[in-house]
Amino acid sequence: MIQSTRISMGLFFKYFLSLTKIDPGQNYISLPSIKSSTHIALLFMVSMGTQKLKAQSFFIFSLLLTLILFCITTLYNENTNVKLIPQMNYLMVVVALFFLNAVIFLFMLMKYFTNKQILPTLILSLAFLSGLIYLVETIVIIHKPINGSTLIQTKSNDVSIFYIFRQLSFICLTSLALFCYGKDNILDNNKKKTGILLLALIPFLVFPLLAHNLSSYNADYSLYVVDYCPDNHTATWGINYTKILVCLWAFLLFFIIMRTRLASELWPLIALLCLASLCCNLLLLTLDEYNYTIWYISRGIEVSSKLFVVSFLIYNIFQELQLSSKLAVHDVLTNIYNRRYFFNSVESLLSRPVVKDFCVMLVDINQFKRINAQWGHRVGDKVLVSIVDIIQQSIRPDDILARLEGEVFGLLFTELNSAQAKIIAERMRKNVELLTGFSNRYDVPEQMTISIGTVFSTGDTRNISLVMTEADKALREAKSEGGNKVIIHHI
């Protein structure tokens, strides 16, 4: 077990280092690019497509990934001659964060509109929307031309202020969403719901206004987070602010785990973002001097984590669409096709330019209403599922089996003759009678039988109404003769 774990981790490190670019001349390491991070996210999506991950295992793996990123960046940045990253590169990172936050906001908002009972989802969407405000402010600051050391210090200080308040807004709104998690009484009370939303406006609107006024836009109330040294062209980061952020992220991560137990699909993603932000700020604590390289690395961690969140949300949407498509044409109880799909299939067959031999069967479970009345609907459902399983074992894989209503099923067969249709129908009838007999493996209370009405056509008819009418006549004829029979009509 230990050896296999070492091999797996070795392969992971080998893949990660192949994506990581090290410049020997500059002696520093940069995180994987956005494209490489997408490769990692896609690998996760493929693995999730093959097996359904539990929330706990998903979070543990994300924890290991983020810690590995943190250790690698810290290791390669010790005692290095750090150089400034070009301003345009940093602008690209901020723009990437802007679009990632916008995408996550839209996903969260759409998820809320699909189920307006989930108030925490709406509050979380506001958390990502608030980040867009700070990122717009940051982009405007970066675009300002540099005319001396004073403006460099001002730009660095403003970027730091918006960075701090962006995290504070996210922490406050996430904490409020966490407070509402699992409290249905808030949703039932409109006054409480309105109060919660008004409270959410403080970090959503008041914090950005406060950050704007504490920046260089208002000289009377400026907050100085960064001290610029013109001699060596470095800016010293206020470490106390980082310590506060580290504590807040750590407490938020702890309470998310304790409150939600990572039970839903959404909260493990939020926990991952908290963990990434925690590591970003811890990375800043490990260095004595503020510089754009380390800032760029921390933003790279945030980009990677949010790329993964976006990838998972897209994967989740495709899963829900797949489930919705399946429910649209499948019966919930028996997991076979429903009436709508069956009739569409028959109409599609009859509308072909050339229609070959085909057969439609209607199957009715004899004495099913008595089973429901005597044993209850729970046993009745078990009988339905059992007979469906027996019928599926008696027909070909490409044949269509659908539940039309109650205990009536429809089957559509193609590429067979009348004799083959009779053989299949008799096989179904005998198997149901035999496999539901005494001490059967399906645990149905008594032996069951079915009646089958069959209509066979050589392809001359194109009228679905005629086909279904003849099949229904054959079924009623089989039941009128005592049931447990197969009657075939030809058209």
UniProtKB/Swiss-Prot annotation:
Main location: membrane
One Pfam family in the UniProt entry: GGDEF
Membrane-topology descriptor: Multi-pass membrane protein
Cofactor-binding details, from the entry: Binds 1 Mg(2+) ion per monomer.
Binding, substrate: N372, H377, D381, R427
Swiss-Prot/TrEMBL induction comment: Induced by 0.3M NaCl in an RpoS-dependent fashion.
EC number(s) given by UniProt: 2.7.7.65
Observed effect of gene inactivation: Deletion of the gene increases swimming motility and early biofilm formation.
First-tier enzyme category under EC: transferase
Intervals, Periplasmic compartment: 76-89, 143-158, 215-236, 287-293
Cytoplasmic topological domain: 1-54, 111-121, 180-193, 258-265, 315-491
Statement: the UniProt record of this protein carries the keyword Cell membrane: yes
GO BP annotations listed: cell adhesion involved in single-species biofilm formation; negative regulation of bacterial-type flagellum-dependent cell motility
Keywords from the named record: Cell inner membrane, Cell membrane, GTP-binding, Magnesium, Membrane, Metal-binding, Nucleotide-binding, Transferase, Transmembrane, Transmembrane helix
Catalytic residues identified in the record: E407
Site (Transition state stabilizer): K369
Subcellular location: Cell inner membrane
NCBIfam families, per database record: GGDEF
SUBUNIT field: Homodimer.
Described function: Catalyzes the synthesis of cyclic-di-GMP (c-di-GMP) via the condensation of 2 GTP molecules.
Name this polypeptide is given: Probable diguanylate cyclase CdgI
Species for this entry: Escherichia coli (strain K12)
